[in-house]
Every structure is written in C-alpha cells, then in structure tokens.
Amino acid sequence: MLKRIQQKWLAIKLITRMDKPIGTYLLLWPTYWALWIASDGWPNLQLLLVFSLGVFIMRSAGCVINDYADRKIDGEVERTKNRPLVNGMMTSGEAINLFGVLIGMAFGLVLMLSWSTIYLSVVAVLLAAIYPFMKRHTQLPQLFLGAAFSWGMIMAFSEAQGEIPLVAWLLFTANLCWTIAYDTMYAMVDRDDDVKIGVKSTAILFAENDKRVIGFLQLMTLALLWTVGDILAFGWPYQLCIIAAAGLFSYQQLLIVNRERDACFQAFLHNHWVGLVVFVGIAIEYL
C-alpha cells in the first residue's frame, strides 16, 4: 500500500514538473512585475500569496493537460519518452482527474479576489487548456502559450487597481514576445522529432530564420519594457537592469548559434535570469 502511494506521488511529481521549476519561474517573474507595478511596489500579503500559489498550481495544471494532449506522441520524442502517461505510471483518467483537482484549487484561490478578476480567470483556464492542442492545428502554438503566461499580469492589474491601464497591456505584449522567443528555443530542441511526427511549432515555422526572429522578439521585449519604464518615470537602476537583460539575451544568441540541442535547452533555461533581473529593476524603483 505504502509503495503504491509512493509510486503515485512520484507520478504526480513528474507530470506536474515539481522537479523542474523553470516553468514556474518563467510564469512567476512576469506576474511579479505586474503585481509590483500595479501595487506601487507594495502588494498586500493576501494578493502576493494568492498569485504566487496560483502560478504554481496553474503551471502544474498546464503540464498535466499538456502531457494528456501529447500522450500518444510523447513516446516518439527522445526528451519526453519517459513521461508518466507514456511509461504507464499514470493513466489518462487519473491525469484528467488531477487536472480537475488543480483547476479547482486555483478557482478556490481566485474566489478570494474581486468579481472582475474572477471573470478574467476564466480566460486563463481556457488558454491553459487549449494551448497543448494548438500544436496540431497551428504553426504558432507559442503564441497561445505566451498569452497564457501573460494573462496573470492582466489579472494582477485588475485586482490591484480595479482597471487595466495601458502599462498592463504593454507588459502583456512584452511578455508575449519574450515567451515566444524562449519557447522557440525550447522547440528547437525537439524540432527534428516534431517534424517526423507532425507536431507544429514556431521553431519549424521560422526554420532557418529562427535565430533572427528570436532576436527580433527579444528586441521587442526590451523596447516595450523600456517604454514601460519611461511611462512610469523609472530611473537609471531600472534602465541598467534592462541593459543587463539585453546582455543576457546576447548570451542566449551565442548559445543557439549552432542550433545544438543541449545549447538551445540551456538558452531556454537561462531566461529565468532575465525575468529575475527585470524584477529587480522594478523592485528597486519602489524602495
């Protein structure tokens, strides 16, 4: 009995990527950008806890529904062939039940917020649920992932300010560009396998222009973040952090220059530091 419980817990840990927190970081940092700006640097404890836990739960739910959507093809991809729904550690029914539990937990958190934010949360759930299936229907699944990873920023402004100002949409667009850029790097890791099994991605769409498009998206991210700083009259510490982020992007371009799988994956992981550096720049402005 104990062994069975341990096996199920391991399956839950693996399918929700508890052992791989990079996705949580990439979702958390932009949410914190928005929370700090929307709250003038001082989000109340309840707001901070609700959005922090919400990020962890929704990222976990997104991983579960992603694996459910890919359960019939993950075995054909080197990186994903040992996932729980492929190796039999978890059944499809158990995965759907787990997804439902996680969405229920997230909804419980959202009920602590205003009605306008509750309504916006419905969009967040829809984006999280449909993204995994977009890989079969569009060459731009990363666009849907970007929207899913950015929607929490809109919710943060809605809750903290009761409105969604221009700055919120600029941050949303900046994060959208950034997400497409780093997830294209991630898709470059699996590109050869994806072509064979018919899965679509921006890495396949951009083809030989992948590095140039990623660079353009990174420049757009920096330009939009700089514009946010200008609108909010942020000073040199924030500007210095945006310049540092530009340096990190340049390093990522060096990593992906030869399109080697391991290097592309390292470039993807490296984006955690971009999110952190931008957050530090924002936080300093409110000290």
Swiss-Prot record:
Membrane topology, as annotated: Multi-pass membrane protein
Q: Which InterPro entries match?
A: HB_polyprenyltransferase-like (IPR006370), Prenyltransferase (IPR039653), UbiA_prenyltransferase (IPR000537), UbiA_prenylTrfase_CS (IPR030470), UbiA_sf (IPR044878)
Which EC number(s) does the record attach to this protein?
2.5.1.39
Q: Which PANTHER family match?
A: 4-HYDROXYBENZOATE POLYPRENYLTRANSFERASE, MITOCHONDRIAL, PRENYLTRANSFERASES
Instruction: List localization entries.
Output: Cell inner membrane
Q: Which NCBIfam families match?
A: ubiA_proteo
Family annotation (PROSITE patterns): UBIA
| UniProt catalytic activity | all-trans-octaprenyl diphosphate + 4-hydroxybenzoate = 4-hydroxy-3-(all-trans-octaprenyl)benzoate + diphosphate
Which BP terms does GO give this entry?
Answer: ubiquinone biosynthetic process
Report the family membership. Answer: Belongs to the UbiA prenyltransferase family.
**Which Gene Ontology molecular-function terms are recorded?**
4-hydroxybenzoate polyprenyltransferase activity
Please give the name of this protein. 4-hydroxybenzoate octaprenyltransferase
Which Gene Ontology CC terms are recorded?
A: plasma membrane
> What does this protein's UniProt record list under function?
Catalyzes the prenylation of para-hydroxybenzoate (PHB) with an all-trans polyprenyl group. Mediates the second step in the final reaction sequence of ubiquinone-8 (UQ-8) biosynthesis, which is the condensation of the polyisoprenoid side chain with PHB, generating the first membrane-bound Q intermediate 3-octaprenyl-4-hydroxybenzoate.
Membrane-spanning residues: 22-42, 45-65, 95-115, 116-136, 140-160, 162-182, 214-234, 237-257, 264-284
Its primary localisation, in coarse terms, equals membrane
